[in-house]
Amino acid sequence: MEESSVTVGTIDVSYLPSSSEYSLGRCKHTSEDWVDCGFKPTFFRSATLKWKESLMSRKRPFVGRCCYSCTPQSWERFFNPSIPSLGLRNVIYINETHTRHRGWLARRLSYILFVQERDVHKGMFATSVTENVLSSSRVQEAIAEVAAELNPDGSAQQQSKAIQKVKRKARKILQEMVATVSPGMIRLTGWVLLKLFNSFFWNIQIHKGQLEMVKAATETNLPLLFLPVHRSHIDYLLLTFILFCHNIKAPYIASGNNLNIPVFSTLIHKLGGFFIRRRLDETPDGRKDILYRALLHGHVVELLRQQQFLEIFLEGTRSRSGKTSCARAGLLSVVVDTLSSNTIPDILVIPVGISYDRIIEGHYNGEQLGKPKKNESLWSVARGVIRMLRKNYGYVRVDFAQPFSLKEYLEGQSQKPVSAPLSLEQALLPAILPSRPNDVADEHQDLSSNESRNPADEAFRRRLIANLAEHILFTASKSCAIMSTHIVACLLLYRHRQGIHLSTLVEDFFVMKEEVLARDFDLGFSGNSEDVVMHAIQLLGNCVTITHTSRKDEFFITPSTTVPSVFELNFYSNGVLHVFIMEAIIACSIYAVLNKRCSGGSAGGLGNLISQEQLVRKAASLCYLLSNEGTISLPCQTFYQVCHETVGKFIQYGILTVAEQDDQEDVSPGLAEQQWDKKLPELNWRSDEEDEDSDFGEEQRDCYLKVSQSKEHQQFITFLQRLLGPLLEAYSSAAIFVHNFSGPVPESEYLQKLHRYLITRTERNVAVYAESATYCLVKNAVKMFKDIGVFKETKQKRVSVLELSSTFLPQCNRQKLLEYILSFVVL
């Protein structure tokens, strides 16, 4: 039942004392100076843990630096060596020292004095937006085109009436779209949020050095583009509140029109929010609404021209899985087009990471169980506020990444000799169906020499914007601090699913915390490990069962096994998945390669040897398979490169060791491996810029590796494999379900049937991981099958219809798809 602590063994142990920016066992309202609150843990710390915490606590990493490869000039800009040492600040801790006044009355009125002294006035914000947008050339052309469609053969008088009608429609759309920022409303909301946030959050932490970089960026008189991850509805208010507290003007926030509800919509407009449709193609016949697109484009251009700040959520909607979702770059493309048209000199891009101990929504179990999303209403907002006031949601951490120049990024990308990326079908089909002729890859083999690098080329423009969006989301996700609830939920699901004594859980929590810091991710908590664990368990609530044992002052902690509870734990556990995802991919690939070697008849000690090249290729193919689960790596790196680097880390950890030369000479690839190697060099998984002297040289590719058999390393590999267990089980179950496919069938209907199948597996205890039945994984699996060519998608009366492609009509090919996915699944 009890397992030893998770560790990777020989990681660099140059530990440094950590700064005590904030601690869970201390007062909520303190800032730089902390005072003990007398919180006592429920059991005594062991001497071993005391020794570890005093000697092994790492220094916090500084997160959010921009990409040196893509934006080398921005890397040096706004940053100086003293910034990381500025430390953290609790934004909602306000007293008279944060105002110009002192004394008893100032202490009583500190919130009012603070918001009154903030620098916010009408002159900061955009003016005459509606008239300027309506008079822009693009909008005028769209109005004329729509009017011509309404009255194709009419007289000049009728045409004039049609134009006036379209103009009235355009003005009505802009009334919903254009925000009218009110400094008074911002101040009032700032005061209200200080009260509310102090009621249901312990604190909201920001890094003072990061805010210094943002302030420096505001002094350039360039538009700023804030691009946060999207976890909760509070995200909309959080950024505006933090910037207001630091005398930075509020950004204009792109909000979905589902929030356009009475009273609440007026508040959002006054705070800088503007509503946009979730789908731009909303004409009755399904065509592009050119008028709406022109107005949206003109609105964004006008805001940027007036040097306003924008806030866009690239994910489009709140993440229901706890992972950062894939980017939707629609509005970002408007920003890129504005810069490309030389309307403004440059735009500074700021990715933002946001982490919650517990989101105010609590969970998204209803939607993950397949229930339709409830429409927002004034009543639902009021109920949400009342519910929030009854609970405490712990800690919030907001991280602003280093601003980088969008102009520098775009110019750099247009000069890079990078070939067109492979589609998922081109990348994965040779691995799934190795006997199939690889005609598709051959057609694109020499694409790098003929490909247009002109930003005016539509295909290149789309890829450029998609890569930019992935780059931003990867940086924002990398900046997200890991919260205590993330680590505890992860340990309970994938380390101690059958339960664990609290003392052992605390030990494992401490070790995992150190592993997170070792990978250059920051933590959203500090303090004694047992205090932090108890804090997390309290926030996880009914998802965790606590049982008193016969041992004095000891408790047994068990994760709840009900489907909603497992879904909720998985949501919070996914907050730490991106820290270990590449290592988890390598761990599953090790299993796949060893399993294939064993099934191929290898025996004895040589059967444990792995070709490094084969392992890297296997891992790269798994990266492609999981690419719909979020941004796995920076787009300026190939999957091959990232996997190769991660294998190098495994060698550094001691999990993999390079085999002796005598052993390597005794190993020769089997026939299947030779065919695999012949096929894959045609695929551009490696960068064209690699040279013979790089780490990817032939001497590296030819080496063989041994897997460490130490208990410590084997347990860590098992932990990593379990992290991907729910994803791989969902994908393999979807592949099983494809065997009985009878189509064509509407995609929505197929999603419901597949989801019902996965839920049934869970209810009957067939599933190893109950969380494999979440609706998010169902959608991602079906999307992956469309991307790799299992399904063909057609539109019938604006409804997406699925049918099997000719490649996967034979049952044998569907079986190979299943076998390919199962090769990574550790039973």
Curated annotation (Swiss-Prot):
Reactions listed under catalytic activity: sn-glycerol 3-phosphate + an acyl-CoA = a 1-acyl-sn-glycero-3-phosphate + CoA; (9Z,12Z)-octadecadienoyl-CoA + sn-glycerol 3-phosphate = 1-(9Z,12Z)-octadecadienoyl-sn-glycero-3-phosphate + CoA; sn-glycerol 3-phosphate + (9Z)-octadecenoyl-CoA = 1-(9Z-octadecenoyl)-sn-glycero-3-phosphate + CoA; sn-glycerol 3-phosphate + octadecanoyl-CoA = 1-octadecanoyl-sn-glycero-3-phosphate + CoA
Subcellular location: Mitochondrion outer membrane
GO CC, alphabetical: endoplasmic reticulum membrane; mitochondrial inner membrane; mitochondrial outer membrane; mitochondrion; plasma membrane
Tissue/organ expression: Highest levels in liver, intermediate levels in muscle and kidney, and lowest levels in lung and brain.
Cytoplasmic side of membrane: 1-87, 119-827
Stretches buried in the membrane, not crossing it: 88-118
Molecular-function GO term, any one: glycerol-3-phosphate O-acyltransferase activity
Modified residues (Phosphoserine): S380, S687, S694
Record's bilayer topology term: Peripheral membrane protein
Keyword terms: Acetylation, Acyltransferase, Lipid biosynthesis, Lipid metabolism, Membrane, Mitochondrion, Mitochondrion outer membrane, Phospholipid biosynthesis, Phospholipid metabolism, Phosphoprotein, Transferase
Motif HXXXXD motif: positions: 230-235
Important for mitochondrial localization: annotated span: 80-120
Residue numbers bearing the N6-acetyllysine modification: K779, K783
SMART domains the record matches: PlsC
Binding site for CoA: R278, R279, K288, R293, R328, R462
Pfam families membership: Acyltransferase, GPAT_C
GO biological process, alphabetically ordered: activated T cell proliferation; activation-induced cell death of T cells; acyl-CoA metabolic process; CDP-diacylglycerol biosynthetic process; defense response to virus; diacylglycerol biosynthetic process; fatty acid homeostasis; fatty acid metabolic process
Enzyme Commission identifier(s): 2.3.1.15
The protein's annotated pathway: Phospholipid metabolism; CDP-diacylglycerol biosynthesis; CDP-diacylglycerol from sn-glycerol 3-phosphate: step 1/3
Role according to the record: Mitochondrial membrane protein that catalyzes the essential first step of biosynthesis of glycerolipids such as triglycerides, phosphatidic acids and lysophosphatidic acids. Esterifies acyl-group from acyl-coenzyme A (acyl-CoA) to the sn-1 position of glycerol-3-phosphate, to produce lysophosphatidic acid. Has a narrow hydrophobic binding cleft that selects for a linear acyl chain. Catalytic activity is higher for substrates with a 16-carbon acyl chain.
Domain notes: The HXXXXD motif is essential for acyltransferase activity and contributes to the binding of the cysteamine moiety of the acyl-CoA and the phosphate moiety of the glycerol-3-phosphate.
Recorded family membership: Belongs to the GPAT/DAPAT family.
Protein name (record): Glycerol-3-phosphate acyltransferase 1, mitochondrial
